[in-house]
Amino acid sequence: MKTGCQWRELSLKEYFSKETISWQLVYYYFSKWSKDGSFRRIWISLLQNNKRKLDLSSVQLDGSHTRSKTGGESVGYQGRKSSNTTNCIFLCDNQGQMLSMGKPISGEHHDLYNIEETLEEIVGLLDAADIEVKGLFLNADSGFDSKKLRDILYKKEIIGNIKENPRNGDTKNEKYFDNELYKRRFKIEKANAWLDSFKALLIRFETLNVTWINLHYLAFSILFLRKIKV
């Protein structure tokens, strides 16, 4: 995770000198535990048992593009980065602790692409961890300003604090917006920077969505364990 080295370059002899363990075996079990949901269950359990250590006075929503060098599932050309990328939507708490994420989407799509499905995935993990979403204040930038998203949040009784996008041209209806609360949105930038400290997540080399997602669950867990000092 930290060095981002290739699977075949794992330093196994230094740690398992008395046993014969190959990088193929390590990857086999990583893939197996990714596909059977083990890393997701670990993350849900950590959240469930340490909810009091989260700051849910507000949550922050944002998308993040990661360059992909090897292609694979949900990879597409992103003009702003002039490269192939994968986009993921993340949710963090008011301290910058990542909470949940949606499935990767191809880089050519904007943050609102399949937003209903993405939000269901994000909220679904919180529900599984017995974290109540009703009444949460959610900050999001103008890229998320859409009637569809606002309606979804309203139905879930989540208070969306979304910066208006002037290009939408919808000035007839006054929308709730708290500028002071919105200043907390920088925490998602902090959270993404912490993820980028893992070189395995800085550039995407995993071709399968399932292994890419579970590398993130592993990173979420490592960062949270450091925070709560278990």
Could you describe each region identified by the protein language model?
Residues M1-V230:
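Short alpha-helical elements
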